[in-house]
Amino acid sequence: MTSNVQLSETNSPRNQKTRPRAEKEEVDYMQRAQWLRAALLGANDGLVTVASLMMGVGSIKEDVKAMLLVGFAGLVAGACSMAIGEFVSVCTQRDIETAQMKRAIEHKTSLSAIDEQEEEEKKERLPNPGQAAIASALAFSVGAAMPLLGAVFIENHKVRMVVVAVVATIALVVFGVTGAVLGKTSVVKSSVRVVIGGWMAMALTFGLTKFIGSAAMQI
């Protein structure tokens, strides 16, 4: 008798309404987390790319204009590349999900009002390629602007190089901590990973550019 009452309660209209709502809230939360992680990765890419370019140019030229021009060119090129790549990727994902939804509808002989509402909600939750492209470009630009702003007002070359490295390191730590909080992982491990990766990129760009630049000048 008790089990029948419990079954009737779980199958009641009120519980059936609250379940989709809870599932929708969970999906919305997951989508927000994915957007935040994507923005974080884009900003990290922009930071490491432009800081590495500036360090590479700074290894062979002390002119602040050259560093800033190369950094700005890297910002524009990287933001455009990220936007185009994200747009194409999201368009492909949207096409695949739309095709799957059409096939699912074709398999059903008749759709109830609830099914139609669910299909409409699924269509509304499909990613927007334009929004994804703009968000990716903005995230990359924010990260790329940090080393540029750190170097723009410093005339001394050595101090400028140190400031770029310090600004990049601080930003990498912030990105690592934020990523760990979003992913609920170890803050220390995530921060160390991100910082070491950024340092390696800057060091390799600095070393290889200096080596090739010095060899080219001797020819």
UniProtKB/Swiss-Prot annotation:
General remark: Can mediate sequestration of iron ions into vacuoles when expressed in the yeast ccc1 mutant.
InterPro entries hit by this protein: Ccc1_fam
Record PTM N-acetylthreonine, positions in chain: 2
Catalysed conversion reaction: Fe(2+)(in) = Fe(2+)(out)
GO biological process, one term: intracellular iron ion homeostasis
Residue intervals annotated with topology Cytoplasmic: 2-37, 89-133, 183-193
Species whose genome carries this gene: Arabidopsis thaliana (Mouse-ear cress)
Gene Ontology, cellular component aspect: vacuolar membrane
Name of the protein in question: Vacuolar iron transporter homolog 2.1
